[in-house]
Amino acid sequence: MKWGRLLAFLAMVVVVLGLTISTGPKIWKSIPLGLDLKGGVDLLYAVDTPKGHPLDSTGKAALVRAIEMRVNSLGVSSPIIQLEGRNQLGQDQIRVEVAGVKNQQEAVSVIGATAQLAIYGSAKIDPKTGKIVPVGPPLATGADLKSNAHWVVDQQTGQNAVAIEFKNASLWTSITKRYLQKPIYVFLNGQLLTNPVVEQVMYTGQSEISGGNLTTPQACIDLANELNAGALPYPLTLESETSVGPTLGATSLHRTLIAGVIAVVLIFAFMIAAYRMAGLIADIALVAYGYLTLLTFAGLHVVLTLSGLAALILGVGIAVDANIITYERIKDEVRNGRSLRSAVRIGNKNAFRTIVDSNATTFIAGLIMYIFGGEGDVRGFAVALMVGIIVSLLTAVLFARAMLLTFTAAQAVKNPWWYGAPRGVVKSREAKV
């Protein structure tokens, strides 16, 4: 027995099991769950683009960024946002799935809201409507503000207000200089919010907005969130909304996990029954596969959906299939009279191309599903499948192979029967170097 090789093998086992047990649960909790596993709201919007100008890649990217900022203000993250073709009116459609949101109506109002803030130097009363309307171009708009608006209480008046800061402090300085001891008019979504008199020149670019309906902290917080999110590049019209309760999502997750655990336990048992010690090594490699897959999901911020979880479990079968191909090649070499170590080396080498070819075809199928799948569930399944294939190649082809070669080199177990060979094919003898 070669103790150095045996200790190296045991070190591999300890590292895999240690990392999985100590950090695996934390990694699992860090992976964002999709709508079908956590509950939430599914919203379908029609995008009001100018006539003759359909939504292009630049417009889509700007719209996605604006929606993401609004979703983040709800206290949740990782929304699934994707184009859904066009409706009967020829309008582009965009679907927004927000998992974990507690207040569905709040999500609808926040995502579709557009806070159009504008500051004018003059205003008048419209004789037809009797409302105060702005005159001339705006002195500044919400686009001139930093994304750090927040609720404050005015220290002098005690009123609720929204603190704002200009990106270019000199702009606010020039406005306050120009309108010193004169009123300015702050409009929100076309309605006059307040018309304070400028009492001093502001040099810091900071100011406060109060008045109108900004009488409560929540109203100020809502306006601050809308200002921070910025204006939507295109108006959105809500066409449909579907909610998934958190209980239903939790039930789906629980049942899928139970099915996955049963499948993994049966696979582990089969590998040990069929390949004995080699099967146990394959099981340890499968643990490494699961750990690395979850780590990849967390690192890439992949939203785990029910279909993605199914693909993750399917990936276990793909990973173990690579081990089975390798072990059957090793058994063939043992039947041909090769020594155990020689059979392991040659068997791994002969199985490599078969494993790569089979995984490549599955990966191509997953890639096609991702490109042409369209629906979020199909794309989620495809992403999880492709990640699983890549990780399985690393664990089954490289890691499991390294473990098996190290263990056979240790000569702790020399009988080929412990590596899946039928009893009596080769008599127990010392492995040749």
UniProtKB/Swiss-Prot annotation:
> What's its membrane topology?
Multi-pass membrane protein
The UniProt GO MF terms for this protein read: protein-transporting ATPase activity
- GO terms (BP aspect): intracellular protein transmembrane transport; protein targeting; protein transport by the Sec complex
UniProt KW Calcium keyword: no
What are the transmembrane regions?
7-27, 257-277, 278-298, 300-320, 354-374, 380-400
* Keywords, sorted A to Z: Cell membrane, Membrane, Protein transport, Translocation, Transmembrane, Transmembrane helix, Transport
Matches recorded under InterPro entries: Acrflvin-R, SecD, SecD/SecF_arch_bac, SecD_1st, SecD_SecF_C, SecD_SecF_C_bact, SecDF_P1_head
Instruction: Please give the GO cellular component terms listed in this UniProt entry.
Output: plasma membrane
Taxonomically, the superkingdom here is Bacteria
The cellular location(s) given in this protein's UniProt record come to:
Cell membrane
Q: Does the keyword Transmembrane apply?
A: yes
- Biological role stated in the UniProt entry: Part of the Sec protein translocase complex. Interacts with the SecYEG preprotein conducting channel. SecDF uses the proton motive force (PMF) to complete protein translocation after the ATP-dependent function of SecA.
On assembly, the entry states: Forms a complex with SecF. Part of the essential Sec protein translocation apparatus which comprises SecA, SecYEG and auxiliary proteins SecDF. Other proteins may also be involved.
Q: Which PANTHER family match?
A: PROTEIN TRANSLOCASE SUBUNIT SECD, PROTEIN-EXPORT MEMBRANE PROTEIN SEC
**Stated family:** Belongs to the SecD/SecF family. SecD subfamily.
Record protein name field: Protein translocase subunit SecD
Task: Provide the organism lineage as a comma list.
Answer: Bacteria, Bacillati, Bacillota, Bacilli, Bacillales
Query: What's the name of its gene?
Result: secD
